[in-house]
Amino acid sequence: MLDLGAGTGLLAGLVARRFPSAHVTLIDISEEMLARARERFAGRQDVVIVATDYSAAEFTGQFDVIASALSIHHLEDDEKRSLFRRILAALSPGGVFVNADDVLVPSGRLQQLYEAEWVRQVSELGVTVDQLAAARERQKHDRLAPLADQLRWLEEAGFIDVDCYYKYLTFSVFGGRRPLG
C-alpha cells in the first residue's frame, strides 16, 4: 500500500492493523508529521517512510492499493489530474486507488446547508469559536474540486470501476481500479 499525504500514519496504521502482512509506504512533505509516523511504526521492517512532495514525485514500484486521506484537496486541479495519471501508472494491474477527501459542493444552496450542519456538529463536540475560526482560516488554503469532476478525471486517466463509495456533506470517499490488461 502507498499512502499519499500520510501525515502521522493514521490511515496506513489502520490498514497495517487490518492486514498485518501488508507492506506499507508512506509519503508526506511534513517531516514533523512523519516523525510521529516513525513512532507509530517503530520496529516494523515492512514500512517505508518517505519525506517528499507527492504532487510532483514519480512513484517507484507497483502497489496493489494507493490511498490518500484529507490531502489531495490541497492541490490545484491540473495537479490532481496529473497525480491521478501517475497513481494509475504506479498501481499493479487490478490495483485500486481510494481517496477520502473534501470536495467542492455543486451549488451555493447546498454549501449553505452543509456549512450550517458542520458548524452545528462541531459546536456540539465542544469546538470553541477560536478553534472554528482557525479551521476556517486553514480551509482558505484548500483547492476543492467537485466530486463529479474528480470522478471524470479518474476515468480520463484510465481508471475503471470509478465511483463514489461514501459521501457525507463535503466529505467523500471515491476511487477506481487499474484495468487488468
Task: Show where each model-derived region lies.
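C-terminal alpha-helical "lid/dimerization" subdomain adjacent to the S-adenosyl-L-methionine
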Residues: 100-156
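A short His-aromatic
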Residues: 18, 73-75
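Class I SAM-dependent methyltransferase SAM/SAH-binding core
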Residues: 2, 8-56
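Residues lining the SAM
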Residues: 68-72, 100
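Core SAM-dependent methyltransferase catalytic element
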Residues: 160-181
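A short glycine-rich, Lys/Arg-flanked "PGG" loop and its adjoining helix->strand segment in the class I
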Residues: 81-93
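A short acidic, Gly/Pro-enriched loop at the edge of an enzyme's catalytic core
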Residues: 59-66
